[in-house]
UniProtKB/Swiss-Prot annotation:
Subunit of the V1 complex of vacuolar(H+)-ATPase (V-ATPase), a multisubunit enzyme composed of a peripheral complex (V1) that hydrolyzes ATP and a membrane integral complex (V0) that translocates protons. V-ATPase is responsible for acidifying and maintaining the pH of intracellular compartments and in some cell types, is targeted to the plasma membrane, where it is responsible for acidifying the extracellular environment. One of its GO terms (molecular function) is proton-transporting ATPase activity, rotational mechanism. One of its GO terms (cellular component) is proton-transporting V-type ATPase complex. PANTHER family: V-TYPE PROTON ATPASE SUBUNIT F, VACUOLAR ATP SYNTHASE SUBUNIT F. NCBIfam families: V_ATP_synt_F (TIGR01101). Expressed in brain (at protein level). Belongs to the V-ATPase F subunit family. This is V-type proton ATPase subunit F. It comes from the Eukaryota. V-ATPase is a heteromultimeric enzyme made up of two complexes: the ATP-hydrolytic V1 complex and the proton translocation V0 complex. The V1 complex consists of three catalytic AB heterodimers that form a heterohexamer, three peripheral stalks each consisting of EG heterodimers, one central rotor including subunits D and F, and the regulatory subunits C and H. The proton translocation complex V0 consists of the proton transport subunit a, a ring of proteolipid subunits c9c'', rotary subunit d, subunits e and f, and the accessory subunits ATP6AP1/Ac45 and ATP6AP2/PRR. It is a peripheral membrane protein. It comes from Rattus norvegicus (Rat). GO terms for biological process: synaptic vesicle lumen acidification.
Length: 119
């Protein structure tokens, strides 16, 4: 019998999270904790960081998607994450385009390969 797959978690603005929820990623774990956080104007940095760390520690989550401008608020927590699972991917939002220069995870991944490896 096949095991259950891993979930995608998302931390983002209302439009981003709503889009992913409409796509079917919304789940509650056995403790009734959701796999998403809608970041609003009154959401504290501590709340974002706590949710990110909770997602990192959940064994049912395989990928964490986070709006890049929100990732900037908790960059130290993202930079401290060293495991490959859950994978953390920074994504654009409607108001903030993606900037590869700000993506520390992408920079780390690029550092793992030389030009020769990619030929």
């Amino acid at each position: 019998m096949a095991g259950r797959g891993k979930l995608i978690a998302v931390i983002g603005d209302e439009d981003t999270v709503t889009g992913f929820l409409l796509g079917g990623i919304g789940e509650l774990n056995k403790n009734r904790h959701p796999n998403f956080l809608v970041v609003e104007k009154d959401t504290t940095i501590n709340e974002i960081e706590d949710t990110f760390r909770q997602f990192l520690n959940r064994d049912d989550i395989g990928i964490i998607l986070i709006n890049q401008y929100i990732a900037e608020m908790v960059r130290h927590a993202l930079d401290a994450h060293q495991r490959s699972i859950p994978a953390v991917l920074e994504i654009p939002s409607k108001e903030h385009p993606y900037d590869a220069a700000k993506d520390s995870i992408l920079r780390r991944a690029k550092g793992m390969f030389t030009a020769e490896d990619l030929r």
